[in-house]
Each structure stands twice: as C-alpha cells, then as structure tokens.
Amino acid sequence: MISLERRLFCLWIFYKYMQRKIGQNRKEWYDYMKRLIYLDHAATTQPFPEVLDAMIPYYSRYYGNPSSGYELGEESKRAIETARGQIADTLGVEDDTIYFTSGGTESDNWALRYAVQNGKRRRPHIVTSSIEHHAILNTCKNLEKQGVRVTYLPVNKEGTVQPEMVERAIISDTVLVSVMYANNEIGSIQPIRQIGQITHRKQVLFHTDAVQAYGQIPIHAKEDNIDLLSASGHKFNGPKGTGFLYARKGLKLQPMIH
C-alpha cells in the first residue's frame, strides 16, 4: 500500500509539472495571439477578461450547489439570480421569464417544441424562413417527420423576410412564427417589430433566434411582441456552453430534460 507521504509527493510532482506545462501553453497562446488578426466574431467571440474574472471564484471558492440550503450554495444562487436579472434588464422583461440553457441550439429546440406541444392542434403548423440557422431548420425537419407542417418563407434580395408574406402564410393551425433577428452569414436584420405586430394580431406565438443580435443591437421584447427569444453567451464575449431562452410572462414551459 502506498504511504500518504508518497501519495502527497506524487501529487506535488504532478502539480509542478502541470504548472510548468500551463505556463508554456499560456506563453505559446500569447505569442500566437500577437500574430493573429481575428475578424470572425460572427462565428464566436473571445470572453472578455472581466468575464473570466467574474467566473473564476465560482470554480474555486463559491462552488456550492445553488439548490442547497447552506451558505456556500446560497452564494452560488445569488450569483445566478443576479445574472438572470441583468439579462432581463437588457430586454426590458421580468426576471422570471429568463431560462438558462447550454446555448442557442437548446434554446431554439425548446421554443419550437414548446409551441408544438402547447398549440393543441391535430397537425400543428410553423412558419419560418429559408435562411434560419440550422438549429431552427434541422428542428423543423425533425418535427415534420412527426407530422408538423412547416412553411419556409423565401427572402428578398436584401435577405429579409417580407412581413406581408408572413401574414399570408399564417393559417388556423399555425402555432408559431420563428424568424431570426439577424442573419449570421449576410448580416441582414429582419423586420421583427412588424412581424411581431402581425403575430400578436393573429394570436400566434412569435419566436426569434436572436443569437446574432443580442448584445450587438438593442432589443425590446415587449415592444416587438416577442414571445420567445434565444441567445447564446459565446456570441457576445461570454463563456461557451451558456445561453438563455426568454419566454413571455404567462407561458408555461415544459422541461425538455426530465
């Protein structure tokens, strides 16, 4: 049996090795970044230093389970609720309408599947555009296999969806209109407010994939009549693997994972 002293010695050796290795990797990374001119921020962004500084304490000191009842967990819970409130403020909505997810893809899936399940139609119908992110398009294709009907609207030469086409596409079985706020490849910004006015008048849920827009341009969820909105942290200098779904007050989301 290995003695405690020997185990501690081995751990110390491993620690020193990793410390040296991390130092080398960090230097190599800094040298690489000095040579790099990065212009692909539409794909992803580097976390701001203050983002990393804000996160580190919760990987070391405040690592408690936020659902626990002791102080260490309460500290984590306060941080989560503070972040939730900050996000809500940017959209002008209530704190309890923000649901954290692993990113834009999960948020998009949750929004579309919620609308279908909650729509209470025998053959639900979705209206979306032909230039949506694959998180929307692939989810729609999957839902079509389950009997959901989907209308894919074309865009004009500016890459935008015409609101009048959205209005014509809505039928009695339409449970959702989903149009991205800004396109991730050509940058076209959709007429969200006009589309929101139509869906509100028609009493159809309106979802927008705002992954490419949130943090870049002001978004007013209530004024735009947005019922559901997706966003992803890595697109606005936040950590990867984080995102959120906004669901208008009164919408009762069902969990996707049980």
Where is each model-derived feature located?
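C-terminal active-site-capping segments
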Residues: 7
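Short, Lys/Arg-enriched N-terminal segments with co-localized hydrophobic residues
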Residues: 13-32
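Pyridoxal 5′-phosphate
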Residues: 26-258
